[in-house]
Design a protein with these regions (language model features):
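Conserved PLP-binding catalytic core of the aspartate aminotransferase-like
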Residues: 1-12, 16-51, 61, 65-69, ...
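PLP-dependent enzyme catalytic core of the Aspartate aminotransferase-like
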Residues: 49-53, 60-100
Length: 100
């Protein structure tokens, strides 16, 4: 449980440092807010090509204009897994104009 908590905090901190809007949570499910359905689908597809499996959620699963990428963290993730995911989010976020 301690490792899961550490992994969640580490991932969220890294993502926020890059400029991503992360919905506050106490769980291991992290919502990276993108607000646009097509963007969330494209972002998730590009992450999969980078070896990162995530789900893009959009209306009607979440309210309109609250599309997001759902990241499920676990205690089995090692720091290098988290770093790879953060780096992939950074690369694609810049390509798609989500972050600078």
């Amino acid at each position: 449980q301690d490792k899961l908590h550490w992994n969640s905090e580490y991932f969220v901190a890294g993502m926020r440092t890059l400029g991503f809007d992360i919905k506050p949570t106490k769980s291991a499910i992290c919502a990276v807010m993108l607000y646009d359905a097509r963007l969330s689908q494209e972002f998730a597809a590009r992450l999969l090509k980078e070896g990162i499996y995530v789900i893009g959620f959009y209306f009607p699963v979440v309210p309109k204009n609250e599309a997001r990428i759902r990241v499920q963290l676990s205690a089995s993730h090692e720091r290098e897994h988290l770093d790879k995911a953060i780096q992939a989010f950074e690369k694609i976020g810049k390509e798609l104009g989500v972050i600078k």
